[in-house]
Amino acid sequence: MKYRAEIDGLRALAVLPVILFHAGFESFSGGFVGVDVFFVISGYLITTIIITEMAEDRFSIINFYKRRARRILPALFFVMAVCLPFAWLWLTPSYLKDFGQSLVAVSIFSSNILFWLESGYFDTASELKPLLHTWSLAVEEQYYIIFPLFLIATWQFGHIWILALLSFIFLVSLGIAQW
């Protein structure tokens, strides 16, 4: 896929509310909107790449996963390694145990589920979770793992199934969100 400057512009606009929220500006309490925009951009780009490669009969799920791993894992493991000594020095034993659980969850791209089960993102306890920010990466990685498999399956059955299955997933997700 060729470079698209307008997507970088959208990324810049999306990161502003996130930065301002984390900097403590109360008027920007909706920093999560920027994260949502990042999810949409990422979904669009990945879907476009996969469908283009599938249409040209050159898509490889193994190569796709390798590219994702080369792009994400080095920085992720670096962040985990940097957090480890600070957690060991400053966290109490119970919070250090929680940190160990979060290391495992981050490693298997499920930190969003762990943090959701433990506490809210905006809880005061969130200040003692050095890897809390990885929840969004976990969501993105889950998308990278599941969605290509979905596209491959629907590609095999015809393009009409893509629309039908996406519509079904959309309706189910709306139902779950209301539940």
Protein language model regions, located:
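Membrane-interface helix/loop caps of multi-pass membrane proteins
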Residues: 1-179
